[in-house]
Each structure stands twice: as structure tokens, then as C-alpha cells.
Amino acid sequence: MKKIVFLTMTAIFACLNMVMADTVCSIQGDVIVSSSKYIDPFWSDTISHSSINYVKKSKIILEASDGYYDINFYRPTNGEEIEEDLATFGDVFFSKMVIDYHAQNLTKTTKTTTLYNDAYWFNIDHWTYNTYTDNPWKLNSDAACRVINLSSDSFALLLRGQRDSIDPPTLSIFVLYKGQVKLVYNKHMEINDIKQNNSSTVYELQNIKYDDADKIIPDYYDLVFEKEQISIVKKSSSTRK
């Protein structure tokens, strides 16, 4: 009898999780469909980029069935703020990303997408983690981004940014598909863990809020990457001093 009750409760909780799951984005036909409620305003940037000299930090190439994406990451070469950040954090940030999409069987670039962030008060950080957390499972890395395959020709490109030591890091996700580059997620979130299985990748996230008594109220989420879709599940909240 106890076993039956346990299995029943397990099934109920599984159903509740399915009900609470919400779609962040999905690929429908040739279109990336997303929800604006998961995209907070991007950082403000009013700098004249043409007057800034950049140095290339890294480069990745993503092969798709319909072509490939040539992605390059840059940071400014000089400036007082840049020197301060280099001295404080090390050379682990960038402020410009250029994505060149080359369609199959074509010799020239068919589409270029450029993301700038030269506002200085907000850094897009390499996936080093150690600047903001001491969790030992997170290995230091000089990777400018994380890439998750959603299918043979679609990718989720994850960037991690930080405004200052007070705000939680920002997780920004772009989906690349058939030459399209679309921002589908931009929220203040800390990454507590990353889990993978044969069919999905799960990012366990935490957002921090404060109640009227200045107690921390973490909200916990699972961000699930699976075939041609990203979904999110709110797990629970807890209060602590």
C-alpha cells in the first residue's frame, strides 16, 4: 500500500512539473518563436563603437546542415575602465561579438550579426565562475560562451554577464537557426549546476529577491534544453536570513 501511495505521489509531482513548465522558445518550421516575458531589457550602450580599437579574444565555428556560423569575440584594447577591469578580474571578458553566417555552397557571408557592449559598467564574462562564486565543481575556463546543440542545424549560444558585485550574473541566450540570430532569454540568474542526459541539458538556476524584511528569497528554476526547444520550470522558493 505504501509503495502504491509513493508511486502515486511521484506521478502527481511529475505532472505538476509538466504543468508548470513554460516554453522559452521553440523552432516552428523555419521560424524561431520566443516569449518576450523572458527577455529583460538589454544593457544600455551609447558608446561610439567606430572610435574603439578591438583585439580578438577567441573564435568558434559552428557547423550546421545548411551552412556554418563563424563567431568572433573581442574586447577594447585600451581605456581607463578596461585597464581597471583587467587589473581586477584578469583578461576574462569581452564586449563585442560578431556572428557571420555562411550559407552552404556560397563563398561569401550571407548575414552578419554584431552585438556590442561597451557600456563599461557591464562586462560579458568568460565562463570562469571564480570571479563570483567559490563552487568547486565549476572549472575555470577561458571559453567566451557555452553552446548547446538543439538540432543538427540549430544552436543555443549562452553568454554570462555581470554588472557589479551586487547584482546576480546575467544569463543571455541566443538561438541560431538558418542564418537567424535571436535573443530568447535575458535574466539575472546564477547557475547552480548543469546536468546532462541523452535527450536534454538542464541548467539549474537561482534568482535572488528580497522581501520587506530584507530577507533573501531565492527562486529556483530548471532551464531545459532539448530538441528544438528551450523550456523553464519554476521549482520552489525559500526564505533565509
Predicted regions: what they are:
Residues I60-N72, N149-G161, T201-L205, K215-I216:
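Acidic/hydrophobic-patterned starts of short beta strands in beta-sheet-rich repeat architectures
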Residues F94-D100, T170-Y177:
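Beta-propeller blade signature
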Residues T8-C15:
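Bacterial N-terminal signal peptides
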Residues M1-I4:
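Positively charged n-region of N-terminal signal peptides that target proteins for export
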Residues T77-G79, Q162-I166:
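Short glycine/acidic-enriched loop and turn motifs that connect beta-strands
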Residues L86-F94, D164-P169, I216:
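Short, solvent-exposed loop/turn segments at conserved positions within beta-propeller repeat blades
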